[in-house]
Amino acid sequence: MVAPHESQRVADSCSHLVGREIGCSRDLAGCRRCTSEGRACSYSRSGVIHRTRRRNRANQDVTRSALYSSNTTPQTISDQATGRPCEGADNTETAYDRLQQIIPSRSHQSVRVIAELLEEYTEAWQGSEAFEKLSKAPIAEFFVFSEPQTRCWLDNLNLILEKEELLIFTIPPEVYAQLASSRPQEVQDRSWLVMFYSVAIYVEHSKAQNTHRVATLSKLRRNLWLAFNDVRLLIEPSPARIQALIILATYVEEFMTPCVCWSLITKACTMLQALGIVHWRLDTATSDVRAMLFWRLNMLDKALALILCRAPAFHREMSSQIAMPTLNRLMQCRPKRTKDYPPALFEAHYLHQMHLVSCIMADVWHALYGQDTEKVQEVKERLEAWYRQAKEVIEAAALVERPLLTAKGAAAVDLGRQTLRFQYLSLVVLLTVSSRQLRSQSIGPSQEMLNLLSALGDAIPDHKGPYACLLWQYLHCPLAAFGALWGELVMKTTANPEQSLKSMEAIAHLPLYLGKLGSRHALAARLQSITARIVEQARMIVNSQEAPEALPVQDEPTNPGLPAPAAEILPIVAPNESLDPTQMQPVDDFLDDRFIMQSDPFFGTTFDWFAWGGNLEV
């Protein structure tokens, strides 16, 4: 029983705190003010103030669903809030359901058709058919080829090693002799077989189509799979294995998928960290070469992390502790030139700008999916400052050196300038569509990016040089702009006819652009078909003069069990007075969730979940 004077102290403490945010007294453990008032206690005597997470949408979604479910239990709510699948749960939300959340006032038949196309897009992007072709009809012994063929492929491998400047610049003499004489079974390190057959496939794939070429590619494919059938390639770090993973991921595009490419590059990054980059026991030359490779991998790592919404392999603090190669260093490492390649100065400036933008890409990733979600505007300003400077430098270098080049070299420089703009616009679109405050600014950059595709698509298919992005960047980056514009068209067909016309013209460029990339990968051809039909359905909605009528209840779209469509192709709609303001708030809330990573029991929801110790020596 509490003494009278003790009760008076409790009452005084609670009265003193009336109107304050914290409802409990720090003086006494006997305060029951929160309980008596029926409010949640926000004070913890362990020293932690418990506040509701600002962007924790999971609990809100669970609460909303609980209102419509009579058999929801506390355990069910707990499982849903933590991302664990409930027993007997059936995740059958379709793309049409998601579109209806965004555009509830639209019931046009084309909306249902577009929803089915989004399901088809998801299946295409996440498909593994390309990689499954690589493992088809495996063999137990290597096919052998004539000596002229093998020497041609070896010469190309030497040229690529010299051009890429990874870790090893030439083929070891004993490996060269074994491969030239068609004795692959005698090569001890399978990494060289993976590099050799990857380059051989790349060389043969660029030749004209004929029966002999098809048979040769089939044998090379099976040889590559047999060479890759060595677990040491993935678990035992070595310079040759890192190099093999990079060449496999970037040169055998025909048999790659976005996820497989990400896995290979991530493994290469992990192995490089395991070997050490700036370890004190390494000599200067080795540290310099590994630092160069770090910056090369950092570009690929951050690009794939943004494409697939995965955590980067390299922590962003590493870029501040590993010295960026200087322009003089980049110029010195450029190998001997032929007349078809641009001088070293332009390429050095371009690579330097790519190293700089890889740091900004890390900031973009953290602004979208990490801990810096409140710094979107700040990251956007840094991105714009980088682009202003990069454009001046690249244009000046091109102005000086382009007149000295052949037509092929000049075309390569033009591609570099276009790719720089392409990289910048893709990041601007990602930042603006992910921020509620900046979402209205996404339409202009989206239109500009899609209009850029006409010229860019003519230069990409036949070019494999220092100014080219990963194929997956060329396929993926325009999709965010595409989703922003067709969503704008579907939501506001009559709000601004002139703007709708510009958006329609812009989205029409994407199918044509993807068609030009169809020769490089079957995924491009499939995406071209899907986006062309989305454009047609959007055009039907724009051209429709009658008010849309409610659709009757129909069967669910095909493939209802597929994962939710990739966020990039879903519509992004900027708030506008022409829309019902009572509907825009749920729209913004829904779109905000598109840029939050799914709950993962290993990584959690952010990348910076561990403390970075600053030790790169591994």
Swiss-Prot record:
Q: Any idea where this protein resides?
A: Nucleus
Q: Which residues bind DNA?
A: 14-41
Keywords carried by this UniProt record? DNA-binding, Metal-binding, Nucleus, Transcription, Transcription regulation
InterPro entries named among the record's database cross-references: AtrR-like
Example GO molecular function: metal ion binding
**Region of interest: Disordered:** 52-87
Q: Which GO terms describe its cellular component?
A: nucleus
Classify the main location.
Answer: nucleus
Where composition is biased (Polar residues), the residues are: 59-81
Summary of the function given for this chain in its UniProt record: Transcriptional regulator; part of the ergochrome gene cluster responsible for the typical purple-black color of the ergot sclerotia. The ergochrome gene cluster produces several ergot pigments including the yellow ergochrome secalonic acid and its derivatives, as well as the red anthraquinones endocrocin and clavorubin.
Instruction: Please give the name of this protein.
Output: Transcriptional regulator CPUR_05421
Organism in which the protein naturally occurs: Claviceps purpurea (strain 20.1) (Ergot fungus)
